[in-house]
Amino acid sequence: MEKINKNRNREEYMFANINLLGKCNANCYFCLGKDIPNLLNIHNQLHVHFSEWKNFEKFLKDCESRGIKRLYLTGQNTDALLYEYFDELIDYIQDRGFELGIRTNGYLIEKHLSGIRKLKGGVGLSIHSLDSETNNKIMGRPDILDWERLIPAIKSDTNHIRVAVVINRYNKDQIIDIIKYLSKFDEIDYIQARRISTDTREDTLLEDVEIYENLYREVEKKFSVYDTFYNAQRIRMFGKEVCWWRTVETTANSINYFTDGTISGNYFIVEGYLNNYKRSE
């Protein structure tokens, strides 16, 4: 059985995450927020103006002092585009000299299209299936977005697009077709084939880790690794770069801010939150 082994040899801080806390519009079974639901689900800052987020200015000043330019708005147990003051936050962050990117499931893209096109950082889309039944098993939603229309619509001169596909028990037989489909979009910079991560649910999620590694071994036989990116293999498939991303085994590094005021210098999200959430009170 495969295991999740954390690589604690990290690079210097490359970026920082703003981890929103609140209720999501999807229900992904592997969501990292489900590792510690008793701690995270009591918070909801989706409708709280960022000027009222505890320790937010401290976090931004820390990023400035460290020379960190790239920030990502993401959801720890929610989605970035659910934030009520999303467009205002973009202007505030980027007017301070940062480049803001987002991580999103895409379901609210049309509501925030103008804001997304203003982003100077990356737009990270999560696309785990193109099949309604499979998507419902993974994300708790059967509706598949019109990516043929939306992907070109969100691309602008200032942002770039990365698509993350989390390989799991439900979509394992669809991965090659998904990658082939996504590879036709010139607007997509690269595809990230992500492995599930967990700190507290190995008993239920190690099955997915093993599925990932089995698929990777098959892919590696047919497609050559041409480079690595922070310890992750880069393989060209159907003309598009696919980065095989085992999050905790890479050497990437980041600071993490949570909208309840917790600040963590630990790249490992759950571990960092558990070690720091009381200190930020």
Q: Could you tell me what each predicted segment is?
A:
Residues 1-4, 12, 245-281:
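Flexible mid-to-C-terminal extensions adjoining Fe-S/redox cofactors in radical SAM and related proteins
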Residues 78:
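Active-site beta->alpha N-cap acidic-glycine motif
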Residues 2-54:
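Canonical Radical SAM [4Fe-4S] cluster-binding loop centered on the CxxxCxxC motif
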Residues 20, 32-34, 75, 125-130, ...:
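Short loop/turn segments at strand-loop or loop-helix junctions that form parts
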Residues 42-44, 133-148, 152-251, 264, ...:
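Radical SAM enzyme [4Fe-4S]-AdoMet core and its adjacent flexible, acidic
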Residues 53-73, 83-173, 189-192:
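Radical SAM/AdoMet-radical enzyme domain recognition
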Residues 27, 105, 260-261:
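Residue-level recognition of short loop/turn positions
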Residues 39-44, 69-75:
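Glycine-/proline-rich flexible loop or hinge segments
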